């Protein structure tokens, strides 16, 4: 089963072996992205859009309408969402226009205040509010580790993504590592995104995983007067355990997936369906929805994701070869995710 594939031809004639020859195997449009393709001496093969050359940016804009929203615009739009949720402006930051005409923001000081007396507007309810970035690219609306137009790192105190805001609220309200792990898991499991091109999806997943680690470090490591982390007596910094990081990678890989957002199937999969007739002749099956230009009814591979809140049905039985430990009853088609009437399992607590 393929996890994510390139879904772009940008890398077919751009990767060189140690002898200076082009490598095609593993970098073609339909090839799966594997660790050996992007690590070691190939670790700089996949780069954020801002670091790609201008021609590559233009080509991707023409081919797949790829555009990246400036971070200040992401912030302004996320602020509108929070203004509606909280019922007031400037909850996480205040937008400013600088003298040179550029835009930025000033983070609010102190702990985020939630509406009093409203059980549906608590900090825990905010953390588990479902959110999704469609055609997410590198996911700048979810996390903002760097400015999408300049490539400059953004410090945690100034980050503006939807998940960044959830993590800020968590860091302001929990005391113990156990509390942090529990609430961070909820935040990540309620944050979704999909993307067509595999390299963008890879960068988005990477950004979310680093975000998980960085907010833990920011919460549990003391800082000096300059804001630098102070190591312990053994010269170490506190980081999430290896198992916790692996768990986070699993949530992220389920919640950020590869999909054609118009057809709601795996990209190009309608073109790869074949049928065999009574005489053993194999022919390509035509997708009626593609022919008619319709959104529904595509025959491509359906995108299966997880509704992490679904409880195991009382009469559930595993299918042959199915591992109950993988909680397969949570797997659903993307279309049905936000139609779920499943009650929060943590409802009493949250």
Regions found by a protein language model. Give the residues of each.
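Preference for the N-terminal adenyl/adenosyl cofactor-binding alpha/beta module
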Residues: 1-143, 199, 262
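Disulfide-bonded cysteines in secreted/extracellular proteins and peptides
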Residues: 136, 270, 287-290
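Residue-identity detector for glutamine
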Residues: 55-57, 77, 113, 120, ...
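Short, surface-exposed amphipathic charged segments that create phosphate/polyanion-binding patches used
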Residues: 264-280
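Conserved S-adenosyl-L-methionine
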Residues: 85-264
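Long, low-complexity, polar/charged, intrinsically disordered or flexibly structured peripheral segments
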Residues: 1, 5-29, 275-350
């Amino acid at each position: 089963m393929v996890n994510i594939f390139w879904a772009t031809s940008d890398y077919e004639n751009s990767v060189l072996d140690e002898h200076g020859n082009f490598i095609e195997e593993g970098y073609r449009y339909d090839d799966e992205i594997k660790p050996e393709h992007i690590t070691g001496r190939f670790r700089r093969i996949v780069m954020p859009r801002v670091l790609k050359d201008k021609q590559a940016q233009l080509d991707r804009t023409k081919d797949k309408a790829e555009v990246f929203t400036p971070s200040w615009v992401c912030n302004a739009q996320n602020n509108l969402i929070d203004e509606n949720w909280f019922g007031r402006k400037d909850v996480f930051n205040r937008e400013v226009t600088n003298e040179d005409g550029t835009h930025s923001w000033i983070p609010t000081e102190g702990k985020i205040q939630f509406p009093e007396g409203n059980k549906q507007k608590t900090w825990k309810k905010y953390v588990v509010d479902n959110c999704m970035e469609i055609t997410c690219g590198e996911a700048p609306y979810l996390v903002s580790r760097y400015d999408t137009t300049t490539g400059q790192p953004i410090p945690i105190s100034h980050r503006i993504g939807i998940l960044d805001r959830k993590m800020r609220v968590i860091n302001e309200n929990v005391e113990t590592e156990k509390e942090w792990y529990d609430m961070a898991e909820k935040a990540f499991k309620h944050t979704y995104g999909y993307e067509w091109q595999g390299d963008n999806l890879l960068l988005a997943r990477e950004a979310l995983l680093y975000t998980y680690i960085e907010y833990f470090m920011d919460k549990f490591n003391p800082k000096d007067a300059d804001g630098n982390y102070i190591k312990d007596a053994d010269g170490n910094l506190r980081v999430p355990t290896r198992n916790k990081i692996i768990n986070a990678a699993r949530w992220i890989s389920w919640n950020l997936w590869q999909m054609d957002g118009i057809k709601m199937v795996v990209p190009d999969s309608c073109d790869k369906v074949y049928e065999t007739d009574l005489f053993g002749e194999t022919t390509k099956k035509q997708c009626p929805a593609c022919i008619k230009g319709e959104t529904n009814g595509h025959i491509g591979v359906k995108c299966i994701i997880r509704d992490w809140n679904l409880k195991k049905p009382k009469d559930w039985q595993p299918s042959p070869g199915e591992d109950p430990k993988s909680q397969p009853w949570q797997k659903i088609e993307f279309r049905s995710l936000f139609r779920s009437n499943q009650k929060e399992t943590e409802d009493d607590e949250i």
